[in-house]
Amino acid sequence: ADYLPGLTEGRHTVCMAISEPGAGAHPKKLSTRAEFDGDKVILNGQKTYLTNGPLADLFLIMAITAELDGRRSFTTFIVPKSSEGLEITESATVDFLHPSPHCGIKLTNVVVPAVNRLGPLGDAFNAISLPMRRVEDALSATKSAGAMRHRFRLLCRAATNIADPTAEMEGALGRLSVMAEAMSAIGV
């Protein structure tokens, strides 16, 4: 709640910190942990590929808060850049995202108040990471759909330029027509 006014007034820049070196955002490979100690939380781990990280003054850090029978629970914490034990590190070069600078962070016994928890305990993966994965999947699918549409148009052009279509070609043109309707229906 302390950060909300600054966020709404544009005084804070925030960076989501999920991905880790060698793990990406895969939940089984993440290792950053948050340990509760009374009214405080102690964070240890590393994060990477932090979009706008060099500009951020607040990090939303997803960390493991429980593990039972191989299943991990993740919680997100608001961590100020000025926190003792938070070190900005270099990130791999991401040339295609040049307008958005990237960095990594190393967390060594970073202490924040437990009230810096964002959302319910153990719900960060479902509330934050899964929706982000869906957006990433959708963005990846658009590239494939665009390429598919381009190839489809080339195929249609080639098929309609045949002077004397055979019965086999007419069948192929019919299938192309059905594909065109299906692609149109899904917005490709």
Task: Label each residue range with its predicted role.
Residues 1-51:
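Glycine-rich flavin
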Residues 12, 28-30, 55-57, 73, ...:
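A generic structural signal for well-ordered coil/turn residues at beta-strand boundaries
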Residues 16, 34, 43-45, 61, ...:
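Buried hydrophobic positions in well-ordered alpha/beta secondary-structure cores of metabolic enzymes
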Residues 37-39, 64-68, 81-84, 108-116:
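Short loop segments at secondary-structure junctions
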Residues 38-42, 58, 102:
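A generic structural signal for beta-strand entry/edge sites
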Residues 46-86:
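A short core secondary-structure module
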Residues 89-181:
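Glycine-rich beta->alpha junctions and the first turn(s) of the following alpha-helix
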Residues 182-188:
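Long, low-complexity C-terminal extensions of enzymes
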